[in-house]
């Protein structure tokens, strides 16, 4: 009996040693170290879930492709998103963010119609509620209306379900009124993470960032149409996805000149459907 006990004791001790980390993390073993270890695990998981990629670019010169952060690009592309069209084609794409209506979208639509250019207009829930006639015109004239989320929250800060509902609810409202679903998504503030991309991909959306943008949304510090023309045209490049804010008077006034300058330089504007 004693010999059996001597044999069993090392086995029992070994099992306890192997089980110790599990017991510690689960809170079965009491003590300050165990509590600290458990808290650290929770904090790490929370930090991972709330990680944020904030889209930004270093502009290229003389037609060079802009550079974005390597990790941000990797996460974006791995998640099915994009920020460039075909960089082997001298074709660019116009996109407009519509957080609210500032009185210039009709003029922008007039110019696009006159120049025969199609664009993507990314709208929020507030824009949807207040601008029925303008959205109908966008659709009637062959433009694509993209999803910019219901409430313009920072998507990475939301739970999975809330993030999903921010996209789905606006899509549902849009479908009920206009009879079609949205195809493109642009995260508010250019903030995203792997979770956001996982959701958009699951919902059959294409997440479209941009390869050019400038500080055009500050409505109280517009710098004139000539400034807008030079700033945008200095950054033309193959496959460019251009982000302009429709609240900008400068953009509305300069849009025709921007399109004509692009064509003068040998560029053409692609259809939104090419980005799917």
Predicted segments, located by residue:
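N-terminal pre-catalytic segment of deacetylase/amide-hydrolase enzymes
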Residues: 2-94, 101-109, 113-114, 258-261, ...
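Metal-dependent polysaccharide deacetylase catalytic core of the NodB/CE4 family, i.e.
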Residues: 53, 89-92, 102-109, 113-243, ...
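Intrinsically disordered, low-complexity segments enriched in polar/charged small residues
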Residues: 7-9, 29, 153, 191, ...
